[in-house]
């Protein structure tokens, strides 16, 4: 056994090495590239060191030359002439004469305290107290006695003949065409729209409480003998969709086994009158989306009949309880994966009934489904052992 394992390991190693030979060239190429990079870095370092040594050598030579020039007494600042040429020339600004040296061309009569900003063409006789902002276009003939407090908003078109004693509280909106002989005791609140043609003989005792909402168009043909007991809420269209099969017990002689495809081998001991065995609290809609639940899982978890016998009423009831949410007018999957099982569906005539009101005997159709015979535990174990042996043989040989 160990010998076979050793041979298998060596052969696997050789096989892998032969299979992946093409990657070896890439590895050597990578090593060569890394080596070249190292050489390049070394070359760059050497070049940098050489340049640095040359720089320091030049500096030492310059310091040595400067030292020798000083010892010989030479002007080591001889290069300053070039620096002077590069400097910008300084421009000499004009200087103002000092206070002790007055300008010989200055006016000897100028007031030393005079305003330097005075207009030279100004009138020398101007009133020093005059308003500097006076209107140059002012009227020279203005009344010197004019009221300085006059109303600037006064009406310039006022009537010069107006009565100076006029009532200040007079109505400015008075009607100029009003009757000057009007009765001063007249009622100021009289209705100007009063009807001048009112009947003087009108009944002063008219009923002030008359119904203003009386219907002037009352129907004179109304039926005074209408039936007081008529049902005002009667619905003539009560249920247009009434289910003619609503009463499952309508026909006492109904044949619950009317299905022409019924299994002639049905259990003769089944109780067809046992009601409400398959009733549940499922959804009411026949096209319930939950009908798409994993029916295969339900089928796999259903009762298995290892003896290949026909299912009993107990098995049928358990299966109906498991698939009550997915019941429809289509046949359900077989209740078992091997052996004999059951398939159920809702009768087409009972499709509109709620699922919790379905009758086990009258609303549910049943039929037997036969699957392959169930394998025993011994067969399963033997199959597993055989598979393991085959795999071991393939990998070890």
UniProtKB/Swiss-Prot annotation:
Propeptide: 375-397
Entry keywords, A to Z: Cell membrane, Cytoplasm, Disulfide bond, Glycoprotein, GPI-anchor, Lipoprotein, Malaria, Membrane, Repeat, Signal, Sporozoite
Family annotation (SMART domains): TSP1
A Pfam family of this chain: TSP_1
Localization of this protein: Cell membrane; Cytoplasm
Regions of compositional bias (Polar residues) in chain numbering: 274-290
Membrane topology: Lipid-anchor; GPI-anchor
A cellular component annotation (GO) from this entry: plasma membrane
Gene3D superfamilies, A to Z: Thrombospondin type-1 (TSP1) repeat
Residue ranges constituting the TSP type-1 domain according to the UniProt record: 322-375
Post-translational modification: During host cell invasion, proteolytically cleaved at the cell membrane in the region I by a papain-like cysteine protease of parasite origin. Cleavage is triggered by the sporozoite contact with highly sulfated heparan sulfate proteoglycans (HSPGs) present on the host hepatocyte cell surface. Cleavage exposes the TSP type-1 (TSR) domain and is required for productive invasion of host hepatocytes but not for adhesion to the host cell membrane. Cleavage is dispensable for sporozoite development in the oocyst, motility and for traversal of host and vector cells. O-glycosylated; maybe by POFUT2.
Biotechnology: CSP immunodominant B cell epitopes are primarily located in the central repeats. Antibodies against CSP and particularly against the central repeats can neutralize infection at the pre-liver stage and thus makes CSP an attractive candidate for the development of vaccines.
Leader peptide range in chain numbering: 1-18
Cystine residue pairs: 334-369, 338-374
Residue span of region Disordered: 69-313
Lipid attachment in record (GPI-anchor amidated cysteine): 374
GO BP, one annotated term: symbiont entry into host
MF annotations from Gene Ontology: heparan sulfate proteoglycan binding; host cell surface binding
Region named Region I: 93-97
Sugar-modified residues: 337
Residue spans of biased composition, Low complexity class: 101-273, 295-309
Family named by the database record: Belongs to the plasmodium circumsporozoite protein family.
Domain comment as written in the entry: The N-terminus is involved in the initial binding to heparan sulfate proteoglycans (HSPGs) on the surface of host hepatocytes. The N-terminus masks the TSP type-1 (TSR) domain which maintains the sporozoites in a migratory state, enabling them to complete their journey to the salivary gland in the mosquito vector and then to the host liver. The unmasking of the TSP type-1 (TSR) domain when the sporozoite interacts with the host hepatocyte also protects sporozoites from host antibodies. The TSP type-1 (TSR) domain is required for sporozoite development and invasion. CSP has two conformational states, an adhesive conformation in which the TSP type-1 (TSR) domain is exposed and a nonadhesive conformation in which the TSR is masked by the N-terminus. TSR-exposed conformation occurs during sporozoite development in the oocyst in the mosquito vector and during host hepatocyte invasion. TSR-masked conformation occurs during sporozoite migration through the hemolymph to salivary glands in the mosquito vector and in the host dermis.
Function statement: Essential sporozoite protein. In the mosquito vector, required for sporozoite development in the oocyst, migration through the vector hemolymph and entry into the vector salivary glands. In the vertebrate host, required for sporozoite migration through the host dermis and infection of host hepatocytes. Binds to highly sulfated heparan sulfate proteoglycans (HSPGs) on the surface of host hepatocytes.
Protein name stated in the entry: Circumsporozoite protein
Protein source organism: Plasmodium falciparum (isolate 3D7)
């Amino acid at each position: 056994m160990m010998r076979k394992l050793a041979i298998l390991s060596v052969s696997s190693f050789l096989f892998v090495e032969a299979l992946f030979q093409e990657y070896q060239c890439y590895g050597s190429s990578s090593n060569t590239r890394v080596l070249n990079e190292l050489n390049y870095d070394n070359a760059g370092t050497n070049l940098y060191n050489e340049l640095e040594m040359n720089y320091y050598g030049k500096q030492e030579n310059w310091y040595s030359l400067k030292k020798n020039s000083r010892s010989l007494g030479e002007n080591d600042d001889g290069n300053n002439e070039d620096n002077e040429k590069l400097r910008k020339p300084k421009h000499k600004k004009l200087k103002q004469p000092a206070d002790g040296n007055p300008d010989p061309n200055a006016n000897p009569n100028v007031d030393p305290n005079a305003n330097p900003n005075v207009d030279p063409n100004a009138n020398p006789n101007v009133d020093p107290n005059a308003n500097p902002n006076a209107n140059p276009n002012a009227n020279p003939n203005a009344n010197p006695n004019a009221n300085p407090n006059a109303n600037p908003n006064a009406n310039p078109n006022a009537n010069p003949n107006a009565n100076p004693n006029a009532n200040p509280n007079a109505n400015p909106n008075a009607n100029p065409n009003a009757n000057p002989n009007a009765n001063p005791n007249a009622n100021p609140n009289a209705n100007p729209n009063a009807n001048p043609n009112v009947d003087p003989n009108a009944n002063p005792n008219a009923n002030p409480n008359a119904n203003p909402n009386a219907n002037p168009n009352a129907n004179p043909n109304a039926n005074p003998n209408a039936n007081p007991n008529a049902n005002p809420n009667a619905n003539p269209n009560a249920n247009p969709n009434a289910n003619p099969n609503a009463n499952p017990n309508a026909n006492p002689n109904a044949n619950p086994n009317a299905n022409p495809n019924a299994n002639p081998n049905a259990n003769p001991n089944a109780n067809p009158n046992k009601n409400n065995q398959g009733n549940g609290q499922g959804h009411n809609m026949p096209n319930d989306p939950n009908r798409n639940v994993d029916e295969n899982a339900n089928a796999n978890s259903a009762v298995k009949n290892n003896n290949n016998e026909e299912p009993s009423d107990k098995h049928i009831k358990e299966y109906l309880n498991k698939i009550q949410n997915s019941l429809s007018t289509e046949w359900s999957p077989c209740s078992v994966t091997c052996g004999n099982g059951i398939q159920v569906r809702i009768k087409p005539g009972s499709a509109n009934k709620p699922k919790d009101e379905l009758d086990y005997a009258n609303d549910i159709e049943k039929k037997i489904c036969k699957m392959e015979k169930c394998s025993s535990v011994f067969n399963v174990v033997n199959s597993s052992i055989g598979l393991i042996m085959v795999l071991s043989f393939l990998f070890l040989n």
